[in-house]
UniProtKB/Swiss-Prot annotation:
One of its GO terms (biological process) is post-embryonic development. It comes from Arabidopsis thaliana (Mouse-ear cress). Involved in the regulation of glutamyl-tRNA reductase (GluTR) which is important for the synthesis and distribution of 5-aminolevulinate, a precursor in heme and chlorophyll biosynthesis. Stimulates GluTR activity and regulates glutamate-1-semialdehyde release. May play a role in heme metabolism. Necessary for efficient photosynthetic electron transport in chloroplasts. Gene3D superfamilies: Electron Transport, Fmn-binding Protein, Chain A (2.30.110.10), PNP-oxidase-like (3.20.180.10). GO terms for molecular function: protein-membrane adaptor activity. Its main location: plastid. Pfam families: DUF2470. This is Glutamyl-tRNA reductase-binding protein, chloroplastic. InterPro entries: DUF2470, Haem_oxidase_HugZ-like_sf, Split_barrel_FMN-bd. It comes from the Eukaryota. Disruption phenotype: Reduced growth, slightly pale green leaves, reduced levels of chlorophyll and heme, and low non-photochemical quenching (NPQ). Keywords: Chlorophyll biosynthesis, Chloroplast, Heme biosynthesis, Plastid, Transit peptide. It is found in: Plastid, Chloroplast stroma.
Amino acid sequence: MQLQTQSFALNLLPSPNFAKPIERREFISLKRDPSRPISLRCSVSTTLDTPATASTHKPFPAEVSRSIMELSSVGTLSTLTHDGWPLGVGVRFAVDKDGTPVLCLNRSVSPDKRSALHVQLEQCGLRTPQCTIQGSIGRPGDDTVLKRLSATWREKFGEEVKEDSLYVVAVDRVLQMEDFMEDGIWVASSDYKNASPDPLRDIAEDIVNQINANNMEDIFRFCNVYVDLDFVVSETKMIWMDRLGFDLRVWSPRGVYDVRIPFPMEVTDEKGAKSSFNGMSQLAWEVEKSYCPADFNKVKLLKQVVGSSHSHKGGGQ
């Protein structure tokens, strides 16, 4: 598996060309003089029902797993007891630069070192992506590693830890799932370690909450302009945002769906994400008002949400 680092310039139409850069970090609703020509172009390409690759404009499962582990601090560690029964207990954990879980345990582990660490990340009450790390649990190798892992724990939790209570899970493979009751994708250890967590991970939730609170008109407009729909949208909310785009939850009389809308180009920080959103909002408004043509490919893939605790209207909020 190759990590996804390329731009989508070859796959998408030209990216937004702002006459004047947007300096503000707030989300704005731009309204232009319809008599003035515009040069802004935003691209939304049709996605395919395939694993996460460049064609789906989504991060690879390895990247998603790394982001989940970076954002989370608690999980369920399952090991085999001395009598052979599986036992799962809640644990706190940190991760090192390669994504290796670092645990603090007050008990000795089973002679059978096989273990699984299951971690979930709720996204704005609408979706719960998760990953399960399979590997061998054991003590760090030497004093140098111990000191480094102690520093990792201290940075994560702001507290000192007894070095003799530190354990690590040597990652063998990772099962990544987008939500409850969905099929997972296995990620190789090398892909997981070489992947980078999403650059927006620490700010994504705040951005999404701002949009859902203040830009609902824009989100409805995105559904109508950028997505090829043949039904009326009753309600919609943004689920999550990453460097390649964002996911929307759409409620309708026909059912509940998730849809992926890509950014015109990859973003790497808060300013880039908000500028891209504002540019897409402006273009959608002008297309809706017939001030410019819808000169882009609409998203055609909608993923129906079934059997999820988050699928009811309002997302449990």
